[in-house]
Amino acid sequence: MQLYRFIVIGKVQGVFYRKSVSQNAMKAGYRGTVKNLNDGTVEVYAELLDDEISGFLELLKEGSPASVVHDISYVSANSERLEYDGFVIL
């Protein structure tokens, strides 16, 4: 497992995006966190295997019914493991 940091750009705040991502990620068995940033984007940390990245990106693109995702960037995060179980909204 590797920890990845995702930044989601678009209409992703005030539209239940974090709640939808958290619920769908937990259903799929992912561990991570999702958090609003001051610049209007959403930051997501997730522990994934390399072959899970494309499926997780689809989950992030889906978001909530009212959200509109314009772009998602991601990098490998330099951290050992998450401190949380499940998928936590911060």
Task: Spell out what each predicted region is.
Residues 1-90:
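Intrinsically disordered, low-complexity, mixed-charge
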